[in-house]
Every structure is written in structure tokens, then in C-alpha cells.
Regions:
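Catalytic-core signal marking the mid-to-C-terminal active-site face
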Residues: 3-12, 19, 246, 251-350
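Residues forming anionic-ligand binding surfaces in small-molecule and nucleic-acid pockets
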Residues: 70-81, 92-108, 203-221
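Small-residue-enriched flexible segments
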Residues: 183-248, 259-261
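A generic, well-ordered mixed alpha/beta core segment in the N-terminal half of proteins
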Residues: 79-168
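Active-site cofactor/substrate anionic-group-binding motifs, chiefly glycine-
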Residues: 46-99
């Protein structure tokens, strides 16, 4: 593994994206979110994505010529056509709109269709939490990979769901999880680091359990299992309804053979705590809950009980000090891309 100074990696990522066709402000936004994913320990959503994103611009999967537009709007709701634009930009604008509506009317619900790959839902939940809102979100991923409980053929994508809860002192509770037994990003991280993939995550094309990602990839291709058996399977269908059907994006399966890896249907919601009680009173109770959870005795083999989002913030603080960790394969791909784009200012490992 290599480590890079945060600011240097961020500048390099911006240059790569801009050189690959991303508009200036958007290249900065996407670079910030990708590097943030690496900082927080989610390299599958980090700078490893840059070559794919640029390839998607080249093949038309990402459309940078047409901006997102609001198709339908009410006091607390909006439907946004993402126009296949850069997913992080579409989602940031969508959550910002939901927050504005929540400030004015108590709640905001924005659905996005035809959005590009949106990255980590947690980023948009943090936007809501930092605004003193409770955030909710889900995505219908346009690339089929996950089966239903009892099945062996793909039904949905890894379709994430996420929640954000505001709290004092930067201790927001941020929960972001794939409805597959393991996210594609986590699996890619393990493959890059030659780490084992546990049992109960994948089936091969014949429906047999496998821990070999090469067997999963095929051909013929296998499937991911849902998390928590029938529970995760049910949650995945809800994400498909909210992100796919409600948004007008359509079922994920309709995009499988149309470059679906770059098409997301997204559901975003923010609602104002102050519609229910004073914000300080809410914060007091959340503080009490956090303190109570942290005071519980850890089970054997555990040193501490963590809240959703807490470990990610600790990793971020550590890597800001020690350098951002990037695996050698990802770095080689970025260097190759920099050479193709004639970008000569390249950061050195810390």
C-alpha cells in the first residue's frame, strides 16, 4: 500500500478529472468526494473510480453536455431528470433542494432519474445532518448483481440505503449500507488487497456458494446474496421501488444491457427536526443515546462499541495525519491515465 498527502492527492485527482472532460467546478466536487471515500476507508468509492468515470464520458455513459433539470415540483417534492450527468453533482443538487424545501415546509423529498453513478449515499446524508435535518436515501442501481432470498438469478443491484441523524460535536449518526451481503466497493477492496471474501456473500452461476471472486465474475456470472437473508431481500425491493419506480427511472433490470453501470435512480429525503421538537432538545436526547451506547460493555474480542459513521471519521483523522492509503494497482492505473492525459505533475508517496 502507498500513502499520499491529502492535499496533493486531491489536486492530482482534480487534474485527472478535468483533463478527462469534467467541467471545472464539477471536477473539484467529484475529486473531493472520491478522496473523502479513500480517507474514510471506502476505496471502492475512491479515486480508483476515476479511469472508469473518464471512460464513461468518452463512451457517452456520462453526458456532460446536458445539465440536470427539474421535471415536476411541489412544495415538498421534486422530480429531477439527471440527463445522465455526473451522478455526484446530480445527487448533491438533489439533496440541497430537499434541504431547502425542508427548511421552508418541514420536509423535502426529491427523486432523481437517469443520474450517473452517485457514489456514497453517506455524503448526501451528511449534508442533511449538517443542516440539522434527518436524511434518508436509497438507490436503484442500474446494473444487476444481487438475487432475492431463495433465488440464484440477479434481480436488483447492490442497491444501497442510508440515513443521517444530526448530532452535536461532529458526531452525526450516518448509516449507509448495501442491500447485498457486501458492497461491490468492499469486495473490490478485498480483491485488490488479496484478502479473503467471506462465505455467505456470493453464489456461482449454478447457485452454489463461492468465496472466489473470479468464479463469481465468470463467465457465466454468479450473483450476490442479500444481507440478512429475507430481510435484506425485502429492503432491496423497497430501494428498487423508491429509487427506481417512484423516480421514473424504471426498474434496474431495464438498464442491464444499456450501460446500466452508469444509471442510478435515487430517492432523497430531508425533514426538519424542529417540526417535532426544539433542535436543542433533540440534540440532548441524541447525546444521551450516544453516551449510553458507548458506555455498554464490549463483547469478548471487541475493544469498543462504535456508532454508525464513527469508525469512518476516525480513519479520516488518522489518514489526514499519516497520508491517504492507495493500493498499488489503483495507483498504477492513475499514473497510466496521467500519462495519456499528459499530466506531468504527479504526487510522490508520503
Amino acid at each position: 500500500m502507498l500513502r499520499f498527502e491529502h492535499a496533493a492527492l486531491l489536486r492530482f485527482s482534480e487534474r485527472l478529472l478535468a483533463g478527462g472532460g469534467f467541467p471545472g467546478e464539477d471536477s473539484r466536487l467529484v475529486a473531493r468526494l472520491l478522496v473523502k471515500a479513500d480517507l474514510r476507508g471506502y476505496p471502492g468509492h475512491g479515486v480508483t473510480r476515476i479511469p472508469s468515470y473518464i471512460a464513461w464520458i468518452e463512451d457517452g455513459t456520462i453526458n456532460i453536455r446536458e445539465k440536470p433539470k427539474i421535471e415536476r415540483e411541489g412544495k415538498i417534492s421534486a422530480v429531477v431528470d439527471g440527463s445522465h450527468y455526473i451522478g455526484q453533482v446530480v445527487a448533491c443538487e438533489g439533496m440541497a433542494l430537499a434541504i431547502r424545501k425542508a427548511k421552508e415546509h418541514g420536509a423535502g423529498i426529491v427523486v432523481l432519474r437517469r443520474a450517473g453513478h452517485t457514489g456514497r449515499l453517506a455524503d448526501y446524508m451528511e449534508m442533511a445532518a449538517e443542516a440539522g435535518m434527518i436524511g434518508m436515501g436509497s438507490v436503484s442501481v442500474g446494473s444487476g448483481s444481487t438475487t432475492s432470498y431463495g433465488g440464484m438469478e440477479r434481480v436488483t443491484g447492490t442497491n444501497p440505503m442510508a440515513f443521517g441523524v444530526p448530532a452535536r460535536n461532529g458526531r452525526q449518526i450516518i448509516l449507509d449500507f448495501a442491500t447485498a451481503a457486501m458492497s461491490m466497493g468492499e469486495i473490490q477492496k478485498r480483491v485488490a488487497r488479496e484478502e479473503a471474501i467471506p462465505e455467505g456473500v456470493m453464489l456461482d452461476a449454478r447457485g452454489n456458494p463461492t468465496t472466489d471472486f473470479k468464479t463469481f465474475r465468470g463467465p457465466p456470472r454468479g450473483v450476490f446474496l442479500p444481507f440478512g437473508s429475507y430481510k435484506g431481500s425485502g429492503v432491496a425491493l423497497v430501494t428498487e421501488i423508491l429509487g427506481g419506480i417512484l423516480s421514473g427511472n424504471g426498474l434496474g433490470k431495464n438498464w442491464w444491457d444499456k450501460g446500466g453501470h452508469g444509471v442510478n435512480g435515487v430517492f432523497l429525503q430531508a425533514f426538519a427536526v424542529e417540526e417535532f421538537q426544539a433542535l436543542d432538545s433533540f440534540y440532548d436526547k441524541v447525546d444521551e443515546l450516544i453516551s449510553f451506547v458507548k458506555s455498554r460493555k464490549p463483547a469478548p474480542g471487541y475493544q469498543e462499541i462504535f456508532l454508525p459513521g464513527e469508525m469512518a471519521r476516525r480513519r479520516e483523522a488518522q489518514q489526514l495525519e499519516q497520508g491517504v492509503e492507495i493500493d498499488e494497482a489503483t495507483w498504477a492505473n492513475l499514473l497510466r491515465l496521467a500519462s495519456e492525459l499528459d499530466i506531468r505533475e504527479v504526487p510522490k508517496p508520503a
